[in-house]
């Protein structure tokens, strides 16, 4: 996998590689393929006034939710957020992708692979189990690496061995591969910080002095 420089050319209410209208034009034709049947504005359901959209995807696989929300500073940004959330969830399902069944012990030393024990498993988890694996890319070392499918897909079908709960942690989309990876990494960093706050009961200093006009206006709401 080759990653290239990806400049942010749109910097109004968000930072993206292309303008919002171009993103919307790209994704709307893909709505049916992702199983999305309805995209509706639900801003009026509360009194805040920040644009919010709901995306309905009734064909989600067993174990996944079927309703997703998108938010943004503008109606257009919020609509894109909702649709992309639905596309992300569709993309996170296994569908017809092939997986490799093997134990980590059989792979270790022969091919680069993520050790399941590095994924914060429950203390009583035993090793030596046959697990489903898929190929990922180690962006730090620029080479392919096998990853437990449970850390990639959500949900993972029940016929595969479950060593931990699947989730959407680190799931992100973008106008380019680089943009999607950037936002996925940001989400993982955010969740890590969130976990530390919950564990330490320390939220840190309050954020004050917001001088961006759009953020200040949203804060007032």
PLM feature spans:
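Helix-coil modules at protein/domain termini and other flexible surface or pore-lining loops
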Residues: 1-221
């Amino acid at each position: 996998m080759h990653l290239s420089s990806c400049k942010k050319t749109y910097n109004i209410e968000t930072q993206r590689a292309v303008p919002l209208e171009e993103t919307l034009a790209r994704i709307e034709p893909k709505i049916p393929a992702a199983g999305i049947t309805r995209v509706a504005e639900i801003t009026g359901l509360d009194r805040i006034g920040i644009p919010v959209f709901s995306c309905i995807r009734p064909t989600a696989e067993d174990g996944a939710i079927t309703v997703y929300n998108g938010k943004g500073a503008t109606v257009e940004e919020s609509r894109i957020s909702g649709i992309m959330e639905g596309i992300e969830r569709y993309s996170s399902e296994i569908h017809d992708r092939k997986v490799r069944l093997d134990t980590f012990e059989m792979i270790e030393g022969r091919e680069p692979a993520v050790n399941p024990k590095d994924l914060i498993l429950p203390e009583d988890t035993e090793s030596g189990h046959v697990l489903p694996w898929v190929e990922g890319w180690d962006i730090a070392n620029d080479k392919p690496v096998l990853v437990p499918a449970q850390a990639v897909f959500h949900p993972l079908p029940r016929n595969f061995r479950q060593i931990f709960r699947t989730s959407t942690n680190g799931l992100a989309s973008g106008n380019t591969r680089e943009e999607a990876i950037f936002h996925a990494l940001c989400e993982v960093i955010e969740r890590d910080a969130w976990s530390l706050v919950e564990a330490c009961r320390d939220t840190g200093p309050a954020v004050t002095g917001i001088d961006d006009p759009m953020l200040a206006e949203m804060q007032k709401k």
